[in-house]
Curated annotation (Swiss-Prot):
GO molecular function: ATP binding; ATP hydrolysis activity; ATP-dependent peptidase activity; metalloendopeptidase activity; zinc ion binding
Binding site for ATP: 365-372
Name this polypeptide is given: ATP-dependent zinc metalloprotease FTSH 7, chloroplastic
Topological category with respect to the lipid bilayer: Multi-pass membrane protein
Region Disordered: start-end pairs: 87-117
Length: 802
């Protein structure tokens, strides 16, 4: 025999549970468990989630019956009795009897004592006080709020009673008159009733209609018009204000038998006060039950995405799901994160080998390399809750909010464990606490960081929560956050190489379903975009499509990609701004000087790229001219000393051309070239160790006495002596490069003038026309000596004096 019963919602009063289907037992026990459970016969037709099926043989079934009594100090005291039922196969032979628990069984007696002790105070659990209200605060708040609203509406709908004893539901009109009118009516014995409240006087005439007919002309014009509008009303009450230096004519009113006094208080004062108190209690109960956050960036707004749900893995509410198939060019970083997702999907594969999941993974890389995209891919691939937020959401004006939000975030993640937390731009709250990267003290950020450290690997840490962090400033993070146990892995997301750039271009082209022309080779475009990040390449594809659409093309051609690359490097050509006169000639010779010197360097050094395009059209980036030298066809990770010196000479070729052509009358057009050359020369001397006088040392480390993370000035320990030497060597190197550039320009005067004149006329020179001029460039001996690193031979006087 099988019995199925379904538990219903519990009630506040006492209850009992039963496990039998005998009809006789049901009739006897229905008075105490009818509200608690519903009994079904054999082979039930339906089941519910909380139903239980019990096989019943020839045995006894014991049913507990709870008698509860509430005491204000002790809570609910329970008295238990047991109902013993003999269940057999035949329903007709079943019998039942009710008896108290046997006192002969020692284990049963001790069990009853323990249950009685535990149930005496029903809200005491494990020596911890836990108040469990009988009626939820939500119900109380809703009830009181509804009652308050109803009574408030009734109060508004109840008619006013301006004078005691007047008839209810009669429309009353108040007419304001001067105090002199009131005195006149009192003296003429026309006033029937007066109420005095300080200086406010309300009075009623003995015969309103007669007075209105006879005395209308004596009132003011405004009062007369008002009386005519209220002529049909049953009652008119006049109001006036007594001047402070005039007494109320009580003696005259007594003589005329006028009923007067102060206004009576309306009934219901206690009721109104109670109503207001109930309203505030309802509001308070609602706020306690449903706390309201006045911050727009609270952790309650953190987005939870679950794979497989309606919003599973979505980057935004209406966005599309990102998976690892959409990530290219960062294979190493993707492999690290795929392993974490695989661990969450199939933990037995690693647990049997003794492995544990990493507590945290820190994604480090330049802006645009794809750190957030990788996190979105994890959200799309993981079959666990994924909670994302920004570190800037933790810290606000109020002290303690940051730490509280961190606790709420991890509490939510632990509740849904296993889960993943992604904190973007984590350096906003995780800067080092030693003062090196802090301009001032910020206790709120430090409290937030301390709470984050505790949650990740503290006393109550939870390995079921994995934290992903993203930053492009890993050097400023606190060492306690970067240690193993918190961020076990530091994944560097680097700029993609040529193969990676080509893969990224293919992903974006296929994702946008971009129709490409026959002349488009994504491999050659990848070679043109050395140093581009994933975000740069995505923008490049979009810009190429926009340029093709602007020209009403059906396909995106190679020229569109080339123009998009130029826009990314130098900006957009200005159509309205054009150079004229002497400025146009100077800029043309300046760009021709870059081309001549760059070609001479490429003739000496094998494998160096050559100039492909010259332009003197102003661009939005601020450049008046543009010399395009494409990067090498293969990715380079090292820069040799001769290549570095050759780039220095090329950068100063424009300034050298201006000095030669205009006999020393130079312009400010070379300011960007000088800035870039100075930066390159400083790194060669102070960081790369390419200067013979200073030697192969790191100037910053040497001047500080070793690697020092205290945040002190790098020049503080030698009183600036080393920086003076570095400045002197940088100046000598730049001057030597300029002298060599002057030698190259003087060795090619015809090419400089001819190419400059043609560029001034056409504003843009490229292709075979440009290569015809550059094929005539020769490299002087001074250039060969300089790129070999023997610049001291070119300046013997300066070398000897130094």
């Amino acid at each position: 025999m099988t019995t199925t019963f379904e538990f219903l919602q519990p009630r506040i009063h006492g209850f009992a549970t039963c496990c039998s289907s005998n009809s006789l037992l049901y009739s006897k026990a229905s008075r105490f468990f009818n509200d608690r459970c519903r009994v079904y016969r054999q082979n039930p037709n339906r089941f519910v989630s909380n139903s239980i099926t019990l096989p019943l043989q020839k045995k006894q079934v014991t049913v507990l019956r709870n008698h509860e009594r509430f005491n204000l100090w002790d809570g609910f005291s329970r008295k238990k009795s047991r109902l013993v039922v003999n269940c057999q196969e035949d329903d007709q032979n079943e019998s039942s009897s009710e008896e108290e628990e046997s006192s002969q069984s020692t284990p049963a007696k001790s069990e009853r004592k323990r249950e009685k002790k535990e149930d005496k105070v029903w809200w005491s659990k494990g020596k911890k006080w836990q108040w469990q209200p009988i009626i939820q605060a939500q119900g109380i708040g809703v009830l009181l709020l509804q009652l308050s609203v109803v009574m408030f509406v009734m109060r508004l709908l109840r008619p006013g009673i301006p004078l005691p004893g007047s008839e209810p539901r009669i429309q009353t009109t108040f007419v304001s008159v001067p105090y002199s009118e009131f005195l006149s009516k009192v003296n003429s014995n026309q006033v029937q009733k007066v109420e005095v409240d300080g200086v406010q006087v309300l009075f009623k005439l003995r015969d309103d209609g007669k007075w209105q007919e006879s005395e209308t002309s004596r009132l003011s014009q405004s009062s007369e018009s008002l009386l005519r509008t209220v002529a049909p009303t049953k009652r008119v009450v006049y109001s006036t204000t007594r001047p402070g230096d005039i007494k109320t004519p009580y003696e005259k009113m007594l003589g005329n038998n006028v009923e007067f006094g102060s206004p009576e208080k309306r009934s219901g004062g206690f009721f109104n006060s109670a109503l207001i108190a109930l309203f505030y209690i309802a509001v308070l109960a609602g706020l306690i039950r449903f706390p309201v956050s006045f911050s727009t960036s609270s952790t309650g707004q953190l987005r939870t995405r679950k794979a497989g749900g309606p919003d599973g893995g979505k980057v935004s509410g209406g966005g599309e799901t990102i998976t690892f198939a959409d990530v290219a060019g960062v294979d190493e970083a993707k492999e690290e994160l795929e392993e974490i997702v695989e661990f969450l999907r199939n933990p037995e594969k690693y647990v049997r080998l003794g492995a544990r999941p990493p507590r945290g993974v820190l994604l480090v890389g330049l802006p645009g390399t794809g750190k957030t995209l990788l996190a979105k891919a994890v959200a799309g691939e993981a079959e666990v809750p994924f909670i994302s937020c920004s570190a800037s959401e933790f810290v606000e004006l109020y002290v303690g909010m940051g730490a509280s939000r961190v606790r709420d975030l991890f509490a939510r993640a632990k509740k849904e464990a296993p889960s993943i937390i992604f904190i973007d731009e984590i350096d906003a709250v995780a800067k080092s606490r030693d003062g090196k990267f802090r301009m001032g003290s910020n206790d709120e950020r430090e409290q937030t960081l301390n709470q984050l450290l505790t949650e990740m690997d503290g006393f109550d840490s939870n390995s079921a929560v994995i934290v992903l962090g993203a930053t492009n400033r890993a050097d400023v993070l606190d060492p306690a956050l970067r240690r193993p146990g918190r961020f076990d892995r530091v994944v560097t997301v680097e700029t993609p190489d040529k193969i990676g750039r080509e893969s990224i271009l293919r992903v974006h082209v296929s994702k946008k379903e971009l129709p490409l022309g026959d002349d488009v080779n994504l491999g050659s475009i990848a070679s043109m975009t050395t140093g581009f990040t994933g975000a740069d390449l995505a923008n490049l594809v979009n810009e190429a499509a926009l340029l093709a659409g602007r020209k009403n093309k059906t396909n995106v051609e190679k020229i569109d990609f080339i123009q998009a690359v130029e826009r990314s490097i130098a900006g957009i050509e200005k159509k309205s701004a054009r150079l004229k006169g002497n400025e146009k000639a100077v800029v043309a010779r300046h760009e021709a000087g870059h081309a001549v010197v760059g070609t001479a360097v490429a003739n000496l050094l094998t494998g160096q790229p050559r100039v492909e395009k010259l332009s003197i059209l102003p661009r939005t980036g601020g450049a008046l001219g543009f010399t395009y030298i494409p990067p090498t066809s293969e990715d380079r990770y090292l820069l040799f000393i001769d290549e570095l010196l050759g780039r220095l000479v090329t950068l100063l070729g424009g300034r050298a051309a201006e000095e030669v052509v205009y006999s020393g009358r130079i312009s400010t057009g070379a300011f960007d070239d000088i800035r870039r050359a100075t930066d390159m020369a400083y790194k060669a001397v102070a960081e790369y160790g390419l200067n013979q006088k200073i030697g192969p040392v790191s100037v910053a480390t040497l001047s500080g006495g070793g690697i020092d993370d205290s945040g002190g000035s790098p020049w503080g320990r030698d009183q600036g002596k080393l920086v003076d030497l570095v400045q002197k060597e940088v100046t000598i190197l730049l001057q030597s490069a300029l002298d060599v550039a002057l030698s190259v320009v003087r060795a090619n005067p015809d090419v400089l003038e001819g190419l400059g004149a043609q560029l001034e006329e056409k504003e843009k020179v490229e292709g075979e026309e440009l290569q015809k001029w550059l094929s005539m460039v020769v490299a002087p001996e001074e250039l060969a000596v300089f790129v070999e690193g023997k610049q001291e031979l070119l300046l013997p006087a300066q070398a000897s004096s130094s």
